């Protein structure tokens, strides 16, 4: 079905369409999104060569991301996380409950023992962005803010597919190059919104192979 959709879109023309909630009638962005979706499916199926090929034609910059863009911070039009917190289910959604935080938040938390930061990586800003205040919708300034867009298909996913698929098919160096391209995007602020885009709280310097050998900053235990 995706291949047929890509073929049909290839024969169409782009035109401004207000009813297209994602790409305003831009066929090239739709085609790229379809390729990213194909890459996602093939990666899950462990078809790494095909996944890499599809990702090569997928979303190539964050300007091509497929996002759900809330119309306003009002019920029925807002960020879906915010909708849950603002309704009768406040307290049911969050990543810090009863003194326990989610693994994602632990990985991003500079004060936690599971933190994955190092001399080349500072995740403080993303930790703030992805933290959810489960007690109040209005208390959220990041991923669960009422007007915060929500990703569906993105450059970041596409780039990380390229990183994994490249490493599995062409070797570590190829995968690392694609990973560093993703990190370079993070260094621009990535998906951080204005509340969390503070350059003093993030850093994503490029890795080198030595960082991953035994004793390197990403392999201190030599596994």
Per-segment meaning from a language model:
Residues 1-2, 27-33, 55:
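All-alpha RGS (Regulator of G-protein Signaling) helical domain and cognate RGS-like helical scaffolds
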Residues 2, 46-159, 178-180, 185-223:
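Hydrophobic-face positions in mid-chain alpha helices that act as interaction patches
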Residues 6-27:
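Flexible helix-coil transition and linker loops at the boundaries of alpha-helical arrays
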Residues 23-26, 30, 147, 154:
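Structural signature of alpha-solenoid helical repeat junctions
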Residues 170-175:
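A short, structured loop/turn motif at beta-sheet edges
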